Amino acid sequence: VPDIEKQRKIVKAYKTITDRIALKQKINDNLEATAQAYFDNLFFSCDDTDCTLADIALVNPSRPLSKGVEARCFDMSTLPTSGCIPTGDTTKPYNGGVRFINGDTLIARITPCLENGKAAYINILNEGEVAFGSTEYIVFASKDDIPSCFYYFLIRNSKFVTFALQF
């Protein structure tokens, strides 16, 4: 065990690091709130134009991943309720579930998780990597020239969630 002075230095360094992490989280939360407000203003203050999700997104697109192949798996517990990055993954043989790649957006389809905001924007995979997750996810992928992050902000929009909960 280090002497008391060394322990105090370690505690001080640890506190500095955790304070920085908390500050960066607040900055990220503020940036996401700003982006969401901009998104809302841009897309929900316009004339009402009806369209389906299939008109603007690829919904549950096919992604190549054979059964038994080792791949990263993102369980429901890894989807955040705020922020966009999943909190972890495991590697295991693929035996079913939705498949996705970088640029795809995931949203939970089951009511409690949808209400709680379980969603993620996937941007942490290696190039060309296909991952998989719960059959209770809906995957949105970019269609035409729509930026892939559009779908993340769409699913984080309270009007969209309220609409989705009706089904």
Regions found by a protein language model. Give the residues of each.
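Short, well-ordered loop/turn and helix-capping segments at boundaries between secondary-structure elements
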Residues: 44, 112, 116, 157-161
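Non-catalytic DNA-recognition/assembly elements of restriction-modification systems
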Residues: 4-66, 82
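Anionic group-transfer/hydrolysis microenvironments
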Residues: 34, 77, 110-111, 138, ...
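Basic, amphipathic alpha-helical recognition segments used for DNA target recognition
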Residues: 1-8, 53-64, 129-167
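Sequence-specific dsDNA recognition surfaces
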Residues: 54-108, 113-128, 133
